[in-house]
Amino acid sequence: MKPTLFVLAAGMGSRYGGLKQLDGLGPNGETIMDYSIFDAIRGGFGKLVFVIRKSFEKDFREKIISKYENHIPVEVVFQDLNDLPEGFTCPEGREKPWGTNHAVLMGKKVINEPFAVINADDFYGRDSFAVLGKQLSEMDGKKNDYCMVGYRVGNTLSESGSVARGVCATNEEGYLTGVVERTAIERIDGDIQFVDENGKKVVLEENTPVSMNMWGFTPDYFEYSEEYFKEFLKANMGNLKSEYFIPLMVNKLITEGTARVKVLDTTSKCFGVTYAADRQGVVDKIQALVDAGEYPSKLF
């Protein structure tokens, strides 16, 4: 069975402003997501599932989904603040979505095969989809054995400012032992560095694997996520800004010994429009890839 690509497209794009998922950056107005879908199809994926907010469904169907429907089956699910397990209600005053792993849970009703999870607004690159697609095709019928694409941190930096990245630690066999979210990572005087929680400057090696939220799971992940989400809600219901992130869930499963996560290396560079000032650079990078023959000028 071919794997499914699950696209997280419910985010607001707060730092950049506007619906950045719909921003045309390619030579014929292609979005970053168009390139991900194109790469996924040629990487062996057989279905798309988008998680979006109900409020922009019409726009999304007209501008985005209509392009793909003749190339690959497409389904849409919705992330909603009130979509909570039985016995829980959304606290008054909460506006922030419940986080990426809550968004992933929305796919439970429509996904029964190994699946990848990606952000809608990151350009992941051809090699990453080829590597992940191959791994997922070997995971059919398995349980508790997941994977993620580990980007080399030097291939993920923004020229317009610092970035936050999940810095990965691995064991000798290449399995994830933990992900630590680090903020304000940037290249200064040739060194990639960040400041840790003690105010100390830490230099990262160029090839240090980081998570760009490109994961590979099997359907049993939904069951674990549902159970842990209840624990998360009990502990965090009073915090209106708390979020249930994928790395939180993954770290818990690894720490408990419930599952293992293979870190897949990729030569791809990952980039996106973190800041409005990034936009032109992304346009130029995509054009360079088209000029080099990596992508056709018109995708769909």
Features from the language model and the residues they span:
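Long, low-complexity C-terminal extensions of enzymes
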Residues: R279-K298
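Hydrophobic packing residues within well-ordered alpha-helices of enzyme cores
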Residues: F60-I64, L132, S225, V282
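A C-terminal functional module that forms or caps the active site or interfaces directly
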Residues: E226-A259
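Conserved N-terminal catalytic core of the sugar/cofactor nucleotidyltransferase
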Residues: M1-V7, P27-V117, Y124-G125, F129, ...
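A phosphate-binding catalytic loop at a beta-strand-loop-alpha-helix junction
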Residues: T4-G17
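Conserved core of the sugar-phosphate nucleotidyltransferase
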Residues: R126-W215, P219
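Active-site metal-binding loops of divalent metal-dependent hydrolases
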Residues: M12, D122, V153
